[in-house]
Amino acid sequence: MSDTKNPSSTILPQDYDPENDKGEFMNSVMLEFFHQQLLEWRAELLRESEGTIQNTLQSTELQKPDLADRASAETDHALELRTRDRERKLISKINKAIVRIKDDDYGYCEESGEPISIARLKARPIATMTLEAQERHERMEKTQRDD
């Protein structure tokens, strides 16, 4: 990766918005913006999961003598575990996006190689495909499921 695109050596201007950046697509400032977004998102998810481990999993709610209370606690516990599993998968996608930034592949569609719109990346920084490619992919998946 070239020094001109190294996000870790770039200082992000205050109130920076990559949609207003008229420079080269995925220049070092854009990469740093998304790198910071991904790091903050991952840190937030990790904090939440630590809270779950400390609160939910160590709870004595599942040991309640009343069946209705215990069933309710088990349902809450199962929902919390499913949520944490989804977040674990999301953290994996965030880690892959961070690797793509370091490898200079971030922001480009893995299917077509075209740039992914900045608006899409701001909404979903882990996006790996353009909106059009994602829609095609989802239509193909739906067709295969319907067969």
Residue ranges and their predicted role:
Residues 2-103, 140-141, 146-147:
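Interaction interfaces in information-processing and related assembly proteins
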Residues 33, 111, 125:
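Amphipathic alpha-helical recognition patches that constitute DNA-binding helices
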Residues 88, 106, 127:
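Residues immediately within or flanking Cys/His clusters that coordinate Zn2+
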Residues 109-112, 130:
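Short cysteine-rich clusters marking metal-coordination/redox-active sites
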Residues 115-117, 138:
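Short functional micro-motifs and their immediate structural scaffolds
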Residues 119-123:
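Short Cys/His-rich "knuckle" micro-motifs
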Residues 127-134:
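Cysteine-rich micro-motifs
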Residues 134-140:
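Extended, non-catalytic scaffold segments that flank or surround catalytic motifs
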